[in-house]
Amino acid sequence: MKIVHTNTIEEVGISHNEDIKKKVFIDKGYIPQLMNFSFATFKPGQFVETHLHKTMYEVFYIQSGKAEFIINGEKYIVQKGDCITIEAMEPHSQSNPFKENATWIYFGIIIV
């Protein structure tokens, strides 16, 4: 059993852009095949370059604001309440071209 209180978690930079901050609730190794379970804040103008994961699915649940995801070359504007699943090997990027913060909870699942 594990309980994590948000206010006790240190903010760290995400792996694709250290300026974008996240709080990791569950890190790799605690649950089999779970890469992480985290909360991220994208400030206006922040972005992550196009990348892909060879052996991981990612799921994002938008909690506030709006963001732009480009997945396989297609642009999607997402907002509060939307859920996005990105499969392994799908090139994707995220950005916040809007005027308010975008926040989301996300996790990665390793495929074996």
Model-derived features: where do they sit?
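Short, surface-exposed secondary-structure edge patches
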Residues: 39, 59, 73-77
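Structural motif
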Residues: 66-68, 75, 91, 101
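Ligand-binding loop in jelly-roll beta-barrel domains
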Residues: 88-112
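Histidine-centered metal-chelating micro-motifs
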Residues: 47-49, 68, 84, 88-93
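A short, N-terminal "cap"/entry segment at the start of jelly-roll beta-barrel domains
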Residues: 1-35
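Glycine- and acidic-residue-biased ligand/ion/polar-headgroup-sensing regions
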Residues: 55-57, 61-67
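Conserved short histidine dyad/triad with adjacent acidic residue
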Residues: 24, 38-53
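Short acidic-glycine-tyrosine-enriched beta hairpin
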Residues: 73-88
